[in-house]
Amino acid sequence: MRIIVVDNYEEMSKKAAAMIASQVILKPDSVLGLATGDTPIGMYKEIINIYKNEKMNFSKVKTFNLDEYYGLNRENPQSYYYYMMNNLFNHVNIDKNNINIPNGMADNIEVECKEYERKIDKAGGIDLQILGIGVNGHIGFNEPNISFESETHLVNLNEKTIESNSRFFSSKEEVPTKAISMGIKSIIHSKKIILLACGSAKSDAVSKAINGKINPNIPASILQLHRDVVVIIDKEAASKLKLK
């Protein structure tokens, strides 16, 4: 695990975007695992800037998003499909057929989850996975005490997660209580992983994930076992970290 501590959010975003650009330049048909939320928005803006400077070509890239709220249609501004189109996909030359995001309105969730795993396998697995980390240590929507053997599945969202995500909605009551998420096993099979965190609110989770014991109660702690993880965090998120 390589840990990069930066001064601020902008620097974190630029470093992450540069790593994604390098991946796509070296392997134009890369399979990218993408995340949503506040943390990667700056990274996506930087990627768009790199693309506009003609240094990046998405025409052969395939993407798989980590998760989607259950019960939100894709036209809903709070859906992660809407988020990805607005923050990245509408601004680059990606083939829309190569975009994969769980369908939160699927009639049969079990079939949807198995099909998502099949698509990842058919694509050859994920070359580079972007992750954020929740205040409770979750990655994707894999909440504390999730099985490390989990694949794409329907999740009951933790109260902390609902509380944290309520800032995106008019009220806490509007936040969906379930989501479809790639599982820990799905994530850990990625060839390379970049974990992003910014701000003091994430410092506990970052410390426990990196310095603590590998424990299902802190889902991100499983990343200690992965052979190629880069952690990019600002000074506030790193404030409780014991660096060797």
Swiss-Prot record:
The active site is at D67 (proton acceptor), N136 (for ring-opening step), H138 (proton acceptor), E143 (for ring-opening step). It comes from the Bacteria. InterPro entries: Glc/Gal-6P_isomerase, Glucosamine6P_isomerase, Glucosamine6P_isomerase_CS, NagB/RpiA_transferase-like. Keywords: Carbohydrate metabolism, Hydrolase. One of its GO terms (biological process) is N-acetylglucosamine catabolic process. This is Glucosamine-6-phosphate deaminase. Its EC number is 3.5.99.6. Belongs to the glucosamine/galactosamine-6-phosphate isomerase family. NagB subfamily. Pfam families: Glucosamine_iso. The keyword Hydrolase applies. It comes from Clostridium botulinum (strain Langeland / NCTC 10281 / Type F). Catalyzes the reversible isomerization-deamination of glucosamine 6-phosphate (GlcN6P) to form fructose 6-phosphate (Fru6P) and ammonium ion. One of its GO terms (cellular component) is cytoplasm. Gene3D superfamilies: 3.40.50.1360.
